[in-house]
Amino acid sequence: MNGPPDDRSEATADGDRAVVVAVIASTFFVGFGGGVVFPILPNLGAVLGISPFLVGLILSANRFTRLVANAPAGTLVDRAGTRTPFVVGLTVQGVATAGYIVAVNSGAPATWFLLARVAWGIGSAMVFATAYTIAADVSDGGTRGTNMGLIRGGVIFGFPTGLVVGGIVSEFYGTVAAFVVATVFALFASLLAYLLVPETHVEGDPRESVRPWDVDTSLPALTVGTVNFTVGFAYIGVVFATLVLFLKTNDISVLGLDAQGSSGVFMAVTVVSAAVFMFLGGYVSDQSGRRMPTLLTFLVVTFVGLSLFAVASSVPVLSLACVLVGAGQGGTSGPLMALLADLTPDERMGRAMGTNNVFGDVGGGLGPMVSLPLVDSVGFLPVYAACAVLPLAAGGLLVVGIYRETGELSPRVERPRGGTEDLSD
């Protein structure tokens, strides 16, 4: 009785690992395309005559699009499975990246950039909802944090590659060359997914309607989503959107690069740190059997990093701030997604992930629209200092929400052979 089940269990585990690797590879290559635009567009806006507010709107357009697309994408996953939305979403993102090339050579660059970012948002809503659902499908309580961190890390490792290429290649070979390379990477991601990613989710009735308001309003989804909002607002919405302007204003540079190239390097440091700690945070929360200690620790790390950003005036201090902010954001990401999956029934998993993405996109989308005009009027210090408080507030909210849901301040995680408590019971 023991032999065959163990063999099947080992084969299943190997298959699950292969699925995770395939999703990581696909999200890495499409993440590259997403990173290219960040170090280019804020500076390119001045050259093309695009106002700071409109630049912020363009950078945020993909996230605001996902506000509408995230919930239907999650519902679609619960009803139709993961493979098709994942492949289609990656393909849409590849086509959207090609829109950057059209924008630079167009007489209406702002319009084309905006359309490309909207299309990117539709594709990424499908990709994120499916990728996280796949991670939940092939995981249990003992591996969920690690797998969530690894899959999220696929996007993250692709993103700094895009940041570096976007900043450096555009400086030496031109903006169009950087966008062409990004397009090739993004389209390759869709081909990779088509060849390697199988169906993992239980299919529902594909004839049912998919509505933008079909969201998960459970306490765990709202609590985790709010934490995701605060981290996304500070990390993507403020720091990344304003970094190139911060470097130019304070005359900080690295490797002899200008503000645009240097911002790509600093962003890459931040995101590589995030990617490393995504895996470590998820792994630690799996091994300890508790998500909350890891989450709260890394929220404090985020606070320290953002505080350093507010006072940074040299390359060493700014580099340390980037490492800490990245570590804090990454360290919370895997355990946070795993915590949501721990507390969500399988039949609602796609909607829960979609709802969580809505909150993150509100934060990341609202940030540039608020931060770019604010730093222009009041300076960087007040904006960065205010952002530093957000992770602490998020930690307090997380403790309250999880205690109300589970009756414990630090509930244990379900482990397949460890006999610990199931969070969803």
Feature map (PLM): residue ranges:
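Cytoplasmic helix-loop-helix junction between adjacent transmembrane helices
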Residues: 114-157
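C-terminal ends and interior cores of transmembrane alpha-helices
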Residues: 91-107, 300-313
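C-terminal membrane-cytosol helix-exit motif in multi-pass small-molecule transporters
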Residues: 184-203, 394-402
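Juxtamembrane intracellular "pre-TM" segments in multi-pass secondary transporters
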Residues: 2-16, 198-226, 414-425
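Hydrophobic core of transmembrane alpha-helices in multi-pass small-molecule transporters
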Residues: 28, 110-126, 317-331
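Primarily marks hydrophobic transmembrane alpha-helices of the MFS/SLC 12-helix fold
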Residues: 86, 294-295
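Helix-loop-helix hairpin linking two adjacent transmembrane segments in secondary transporters
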Residues: 151-197, 381
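Helix-to-loop junctions at the C-terminal end of transmembrane segments
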Residues: 69-81, 277-290
